[in-house]
Curated annotation (Swiss-Prot):
The lineage of its organism: Eukaryota, Viridiplantae, Streptophyta, Embryophyta, Tracheophyta. The modification 4-aspartylphosphate is found at D63. NCBIfam families: myb_SHAQKYF (TIGR01557). Disulfide bonds: none annotated. Transcriptional activator that acts as a floral inducer to promote short-day (SD) flowering pathway. Activates HD3A and other FT-like genes independently from HD1. May also activate MADS-box transcription factors involved in flowering regulation. Functions as a response regulator involved in His-to-Asp phosphorelay signal transduction system. Phosphorylation of the Asp residue in the receiver domain activates the ability of the protein to promote the transcription of target genes. May directly activate some type-A response regulators in response to cytokinins. It comes from the Eukaryota. PROSITE patterns: HTH_MYB (PS51294), RESPONSE_REGULATORY (PS50110). Two-component system major event consists of a His-to-Asp phosphorelay between a sensor histidine kinase (HK) and a response regulator (RR). In plants, the His-to-Asp phosphorelay involves an additional intermediate named Histidine-containing phosphotransfer protein (HPt). This multistep phosphorelay consists of a His-Asp-His-Asp sequential transfer of a phosphate group between first a His and an Asp of the HK protein, followed by the transfer to a conserved His of the HPt protein and finally the transfer to an Asp in the receiver domain of the RR protein. Induction: Daily oscillation and diurnal expression in plants grown in short day (SD) but not in long day (LD) conditions. Residues 195-254 form the HTH myb-type domain. Residues 225-250 bind DNA. This is Two-component response regulator ORR30. It is found in: Nucleus.
Length: 341
């Protein structure tokens, strides 16, 4: 396959500018980026073309056409009917002008002369628009399923690294992270274990926080894997994985809390020091895992064979691998955190 058939090569861009000379310059620059270019010098001719052929236009770049409002006309027509990302360009761009176009739906505002580096990255606007549409329609899980067109991310990943431009390669990584962020709900919680993008489960800081929140909610006597799993509500996370994590969590607590109180609860030396300084303060892990443990243990019952699950070979359960959040009530800052079990 010709590498120019791979995305973002072949991106279909419609350019509108009443300055014929600059329209030719823009066409040359876009062709150098391996985009397919259609040009119009009149907005009122371009709009009917877009309305008749929305499927062959990926992005519109339009001059602002000062002092008329033609730029706003095409912006409103295109965005309201088809949601095609539109970029406005102009020779000058005061704050009020930029705000006017952005408020009316412009994805970007470019100052003339437009640099080729800016044009080589305009595909990001299409990418973000596609991801936002899927997010709004709750279709993130269907991006790669049969019956749906391949997502832009999939096409970008399919492009061999040797054929990607430097700008494309550099900009793809943060956008992949953007996609991953879209697969977490608005509260920042993980809702599907597959969204971690790992072939085997890794207990990330956020996933562990949700685990701790569930344990604290249930209390010492009722914190068993099945109930923890029910509260966490993470798709494809299994009871065995929770059981294994709970078991190793308890084992690590024993290692990190060697001193025994007269009531039978185990306290770390640090926790004891803090207790002496603030005898009325209760120390425990909150949902962010941000406090030390005091008078807290987990039940031994209902631990299944999950201790043999895949987490064991993937993660490190040594004392070096487990560091809890340290909460300084005076400084109000977090220390390091590695939840490697």
């Amino acid at each position: 396959m010709d590498h120019r058939e791979l995305w973002p090569y072949g991106l279909r861009v419609l350019v509108i500018d009443d300055d014929c000379s600059y329209l030719s310059v823009m066409e040359d620059l876009l062709l150098k980026c391996s985009y397919k270019v259609t040009t119009y010098k009149n907005v009122r001719e371009a709009v009917p073309f877009i309305l008749d052929n929305p499927q062959i236009v990926d992005l519109v770049i339009s001059d602002a056409f000062f002092p008329t409002e033609d730029g706003l006309l095409i912006l409103q027509e295109v965005t309201s009917k088809f949601g095609i990302p539109t970029v406005i360009m102009a020779s000058s761009g005061d704050t009020n002008t930029v705000m006017k176009y952005v408020a009316n739906g412009a994805f970007d505002f470019l100052l003339k002369p437009v640099r080729i580096e800016e044009l080589s990255n305009i595909w990001q606007h299409i990418f973000r628009k596609q991801m936002q549409d899927h997010k709004n329609n709750n279709m993130v899980g269907n991006l790669e399923k049969p019956g749906h067109p391949p997502s832009i991310l999939a096409m970008a990943r399919a492009t061999p690294a040797t054929t990607r431009s430097t700008a494309t390669e550099a900009s793809l990584a943060p956008l992949e992270n953007e996609v991953r962020d879209d697969m977490v709900n608005y509260n920042g919680e993980i809702t599907d274990i597959r969204d971690l993008g790992k072939s085997r489960l890794t207990w990330t800081t956020q996933l562990h926080r949700q685990f701790i929140a569930a344990v604290n909610h249930l209390g010492e006597d009722k914190a068993v894997p099945k109930k923890i799993l029910g509260i966490m509500k993470v798709k494809h996370l299994t009871r065995e994985q929770v059981a294994s994590h709970l078991q190793k969590y308890r084992m690590q607590l024993k290692k990190s809390i060697p001193t025994t109180s007269k009531h039978g609860a185990t306290l770390s030396s640090t926790a004891l020091d803090k207790t002496q300084d603030h005898p009325s303060r209760s120390q425990y892990f909150n949902q962010d895992g941000c406090k030390e443990i005091m008078d807290y243990s987990l039940p031994r019952d209902d631990l299944s064979s999950g201790s043999e699950c895949m987490l064991e070979e993937l993660n490190d359960y040594s004392s070096e691998g487990f560091q809890d959040f340290r909460w300084d009530s005076d400084k109000q800052e977090y220390g390091p955190c590695f939840w490697n079990f």
